[in-house]
Amino acid sequence: MGYVVSTFYRFVHLSNYYDIQPVLKEFCVQHSIKGTIILAEQGINATIAADKQSSLDEFFSFLNLDDRLKDIRYHKSFAMHNPFSKMKVKLRKELVCLGIEDFDNSVCGEYVSPQDWDDLISRSDVYTIDTRNTYEINFGKFKNAINPQTKCFRDFPEWAISWASNKVDQDPIIAMYCTGGIRCEKSTAFMKDLGFSKVYHLKGGILEYFKSTQNKNSLWEGDCFTFDDRIAVDNKLVPAHVKCVSCDVCVTPEEMKSITRGHVLCFNCKENVKI
């Protein structure tokens, strides 16, 4: 039996997000939907899975009852095993934690469609910046993309300020991307706040790029890390064959469930290697 996986987000003011939590949790449990939904005053961010497309269709129909969450665009992929073991609906101060107080993320960069992305990042005058964490980037990235070497998203502002110190006067063209689009959207707003004017981000992130282009120009190198038990997907959105970093043997679905922050070890090696 296969599973349908949906990833989505929306920046929107949800003043009553505390009240939304139990309602969403109950609906998902009743419809056998598992995954993680994050709610904040800034909006919603989620990856959920079900064994039937109809269950997810009902979920999005349920969201449509709230005008603020109506017609949310989502990315769909598939997995042979359910990538989640339970349903979580979390409350957060920030939807994605950049760690900047009183930061307005509404003035963000311009979207670039997956179809136009390759042309943009192939230009010699464009800086392509990966806004994900290093352990994610280790699985794969766009060719020649800058790796900020961050351990978590909260590290990004410090790197960006340092990187901008000798470049903001040049006002270069900046292209940013992440897994599903939410982090690069917020990152472009931060770069604009630093003084850059020509800032762009990949609409729908890497997942939408894979779906729309199948990496036809081979500018993506490797796989894409996912925050679930699949660990990573290839450019066809199929769960990747992830190998143990110690013995180079593909890990099993059960072993994948124990992987933390992209550190891939099979059960045998985990007993002998100190993380």
UniProtKB/Swiss-Prot annotation:
Q: Which UniProt keywords apply?
A: Oxidoreductase, tRNA processing
EC assignment: the record states 1.14.-.-
**GO MF entries:** oxidoreductase activity, acting on paired donors, with incorporation or reduction of molecular oxygen
Does the record's keyword annotation contain GTP-binding? no
> What is the active site of this protein?
C178 (cysteine persulfide intermediate)
**Catalytic activity reported:** uridine(34) in tRNA + AH2 + O2 = 5-hydroxyuridine(34) in tRNA + A + H2O
Protein's UniProt keywords contain Oxidoreductase:
yes
Family annotation (SUPFAM superfamilies):
Rhodanese/Cell cycle control phosphatase (SSF52821)
Stretches assigned to the Rhodanese domain: 122-218
Instruction: State the superkingdom.
Output: Bacteria
**Alphabetized InterPro entries for the sequence:** Rhodanese-like_dom (IPR001763), Rhodanese-like_dom_sf (IPR036873), TrhO (IPR020936), TRHO_N (IPR040503)
Instruction: Outline what the protein does.
Output: Catalyzes oxygen-dependent 5-hydroxyuridine (ho5U) modification at position 34 in tRNAs.
Q: What is the name of this protein?
A: tRNA uridine(34) hydroxylase
GN (gene name): trhO
